[in-house]
Amino acid sequence: MDIFSQRDYYPIPSDDVIKYKHMVHKKWNKNEVIQADIPSIIVHLSSPVDSVDYKGFSDFFLFYRNFLTPAELYDYLILRFKWCMREIESYQHQRSGDNQLRIGKVALIRTFVLLRHGILNHFADDFLLNENLRLRLISFFNEDIKSDMKVIVSCLISLKKAWLHAMKLNWDNVLFNEPAFSAYTDWIDYKIKDVSQLDMAQKRNSRFSYHGIQSISNPDMRNRSILSIYKSDNFDHMVQSNSNKISRNRTPSTLLFQKDSSNSEMATVYSNRKGAQKKTIALPNILTSELDRKDVMSNVTRMSHIIQDAKTLRSSDVNKIIPSTPAKKVELILNTIYSPDCLESENIQESLNQDTSSTQKSFPKGIMSLLARWKKNHKIADPKIRKPVGFTNKREAELDNFVKYVISISSLTNKEEDLKRLNENLDSKFDILSARTIDEVEYLFRLESKLLAQLSTMQKTTRTLSNDEFNDVNVPNNIDSKQISAMDNLDLFRTVNGVARSVISLTNSVNKLNNLSDHSVLDRRRVKSSMPNFYNRERSLSGLSNYAGLQFYDASSEMSAEDDKPQKLVFHDGVDELKNHLTQTFTKPGSISNSSPLKKVLPNLFEHPSVDSLASGDACSYVTYDSQLSQMGTVKKSMKDETSRYSNYEGPVLKKKVAYDNLREFTFEDSKEIIKNDTSSLIDILNSPVTPDLSILPQTPTGKGSVQHKKKEKSESIISPASGRISIAKSHHMSLSPNLTKLKEDDEYVKGDNSLGQAEDELIRLEKNLRDSKLENYNTVVAGNLGAGSGSSTPLGDSPTNVFELPSSINMVESDMDTESFESSFEQRQPTNLREQYFKSIGSPETASPRKVNSNNAYSQVSSQMSPSLANKYLFSPDNESLDIASPVKNVEDLKSRFLKGNNQSASSSQIGASINTSVTATPKNNDMFGSDFDKNGLKNIMTASEEKLSKDPVELAMMKLEGTFKKNKSGNNTGYSSDLEKEVDILNIANLPEMNANPSDKRKSLMLDRRRQTMFNIGPSIYPSNTNDEGYDEESITDDKIWSLIAQYHIDDENLLAKNHANHVPFILMYESKDVAQQFTLIEREILSEIDWKDLLDIKLLYKGPNLTSWLQLLIQNQEFTGIDLAVARFNLTVDWAISEIVLTTDLKMRRNTIERFIHVAEHCRKLQNFNTMMQIILALNSVVVQKFTEAWRLIEPGDMLLWEDLRKIPALDWNYHALRTMMKTVDPLKGCIPFIVVYLSDLTINSEKNTWIVEKRVVNYSKFSTCVQIVKNFIQKVQWSSFYDIIPIQELLSKCIYISSLSQDEIEHLTAEFAR
């Protein structure tokens, strides 16, 4: 605080700490700061001696963040304010201190003005998101005031009021309980609280206000707020309109005039140029002006409503070509080329001498030389000099050449005939660049639709999802029957970025489903209580268009909301009906298969005679049925009629369950309650004529330990308990068979039950050894099946076999870990515990060797062709004789007596709900499948496998833990690969469940039955962390690089869109008037430049360093990450490339001439509209080397257009640092609107930014650098704000075409240019 009392700073800064540059203006005379240290700047701004420089400290609050933090600045201001208070209190009672007292008071008031200015005009930048700084200011306001000086108290009260005003302006629904505005004494004692300090009652429902959000997110509003604090004298001087009436009502001096407040409203009435109508224009006002609706934290694009509401580019067709209208008419009348000598005079001779000397100058070669000579020949001389009409001289040859090469050629071409010819050939032509834009947009939506369909199918295959879950991931149920329309009623500006992010998110989801981890495998067992709708896919799937026997009915449409929850199972069927109607298999003559070895595990198996009418390539479908959700028995009459050819086959079916709350209670009812007419749907499915293709199955080796199989004549139907879901898979190696034969029960198989029972005892004895054994290559097999370690699995979309189409045969298994029907293909004794079943199901080394005899396991046939996500759907399957030991309602023995009927009995009625397996299998006549030829040597090798290898198997570890036999090694280390499996075992507490039997087989039968049900219906606890972004957006994983790479993957598939098809290209601008095109580009440029924030300009950084953009879609994708400057520069370059591309692609000579002329006219109209940005884009394109090479087209251009082009091409000349262009922009009429040429300002800012910030590091600031920068920024945003005076009506179709532009790549341009040169 004492620093302000030092000699260098009191009362004003000395020359030792601050340096000035004397500035003289017609209205003021002041010293401008060049360099200074921080305290001297504060003293200078609150100087008690100099006049108030409101512009100076307004500029300071714009650029101070380049060398000071807001906290540091306000600390200096608070210190200055307290120093002034001390000065006033020290000298208020001293007679000799009048001067010091006056200095203190003036400095106090000016410091107060600085603080109030920062609070009112920069609250959003400094305080809105900075709680610490807010608390620091509040602490200063709440300090006790001991002074009785009114000036001090008044300043502090005014600061409190300004602070509360700013707080209320930026927050809604906040109560500060401040005193009445006029309660002077109450304000002295009032203590301000921050929003974070208020009680809940005071800030309930509080939020950022619309004004607050816009103040930190809307560049256009921020720019207008900044301009509103300046007078018009602070800007470039502007030429006023010639209309006195307009000048009186609204002059440039009133455009941005506002003295001290940035938030007051000012509207001015002015009349248009005809004076017939008055308009009211609201000047920059952050409270009343129409603003964009957007959230500062959202990813919504920042573009304004003009571009956002533009219709989507729908067509690239060019229906007609409008004739070119010259922007400037030139009439040349040559009456004669003879000049009589008598008319010569001295004055004429002097004129001739001057002209002759000037014509002797060397002109450049080419078209421009001809034009320059023509202009010189027709230059208007001094009007006092009279020239005869027929006068001629040495310029005669030049004039003849002009007539020959310009006027004659132009007059020889009949434009009406040319135009008629061009319009006749438009049927097969279109704008290739517009078509590319449409194709690029549709590429995103095609990719999203493909991923949605793929993800939907994968989810249906890997787990059952409810309708709500499909809605969560935005997967439409009818995605196959009706594809997403990419272009119908679509606002690309609002959605294209979201589509790109959706595609990336969906890609991540598909990859997750393609590459299943251990976590995913376990998660698949947590089945959801719902079934997706498949009927929408029925008609469109390949290979089954003429097949009416396989129909699916959407039962969920008739289920009430009460049914969509865990329900009580009610099974309806009889034993005999099940045996007679649900066990049908079809075999190929001579094919061999074994009946299931799991006699004890999967009881009540039936064998039937085989069918002899099968052919190679027959089909087998696989369906699992969710008895909880489906209503297979109640099919509509229309559905029944479609499958009437199977209606004569009657049998029991699964009925919809009655809605109860507990799934662990089972009710068994008599089959007489079944309604016969409700059986059509299931019977249609079960009667499907299906056959297997045995050629795809692995062969069983012959030799020791194996027995040659005989001709297969028996088949089986496996029944296993599970929940059941309907899932469909199709293997393309199968085809439908027209044959249908009902199989009978194989009584011989039942006789083999005793032998299987004996085999079970031997397996129990070997169980412990099998647990501790493993071959070395087993880990590789497991990793491949889990999808975790193999990189060879292809994405489903690229797979040659689409396993998600409608199946060719049906395999209905009700299993919570469904599809675990293990059937063997060789006559050796098979293991019956779960682990050995798992080894067989995934192709363990024992069964992975080549086999001589084919296996007819329908599941293995399907899963062998499926992706890992489907083939490894579940790894465990409980035994049919498992006991529900954890059931809280039913006694285990009671369930056993009611649920299991015995080994030699037909399947019970309960097993209808438990399992239906109509697989394509076969059984040999020899029922003694497990003989004495068991390969004990092979088993010994397995037994000797090291435990170290076994410990790496997550499934083995989990199963050992389940059975209570797991022991950690000495090191205590366990692989993280199996952590999820172990967690599930621990949390479910399965290992500690009471054992009903000491028999290992009984313990194995009870494995996870009740706990599995709890997991399946989400009754038990969840062991996995919730991941709400599994199928949704994972914002952290969706980076700009991923979005850009997504667009980079786009390539043109349609040959019609390639550059080699240039003969069919017609630029769309030929369809419209040049003035309309110029106006629409003006609207676009206005919106883009309004996205440039003043803060970005002050700290200019061109962030974009990527490849050149060739389409507006690429700009849209990266728009959210672009600064306003990057967006404007990218659009500028894209427009230049687009104009060049349109000309290069046009091969017809006269059409190219028309295109060049149209661009010249558009540029001229842009100049009249004071749209200097678009004007420069077109001029740079026409003046490029590529376009200038088309000399034949330039020769055909109208003389008036050539004169106009000569004037235009001089504008971007670099002479005197864009002197011509700067002069044009300084002399604009603001009421007409203005689009400044941004490159000029960026060039000035870039050069200025190269200056040093510090003269003396961290001590003396290069103040002039920042004051210059602020002047450039203010002048730029001022001109951008003038664009609000444009009164242009958007033409939606043309506006869309002008927005969504594309260009050729540089390689394509070079290739076409080289081709045309030949």
From Swiss-Prot:
Any one GO biological process: asymmetric protein localization to new mitotic spindle pole body
Region (Disordered): 694-718, 842-861
Localisation: Cytoplasm; Bud
Start and end residues of each N-terminal Ras-GEF domain: 29-164
Statement: the UniProt record of this protein carries the keyword Nucleus: no
Gene3D superfamilies: Ras guanine-nucleotide exchange factors catalytic domain, Son of sevenless (SoS) protein Chain: S domain 1
GO cellular component: cellular bud; cytoplasm; plasma membrane
Principal localisation: cytoplasm
GO molecular function, one term: guanyl-nucleotide exchange factor activity
Pfam families reported in the protein's UniProt record: RasGEF (PF00617), RasGEF_N (PF00618)
CDD domains: RasGEF (cd00155), REM (cd06224)
Function summary: GDP-GTP exchange factor component of the mitotic exit network (MEN). Fine-tunes the timing of the mitotic exit and couples this event with cytokinesis. May also be involved in proprotein-processing in the secretory pathway.
Name under which the protein is recorded: Guanine nucleotide exchange factor LTE1
Gene that encodes the chain: LTE1
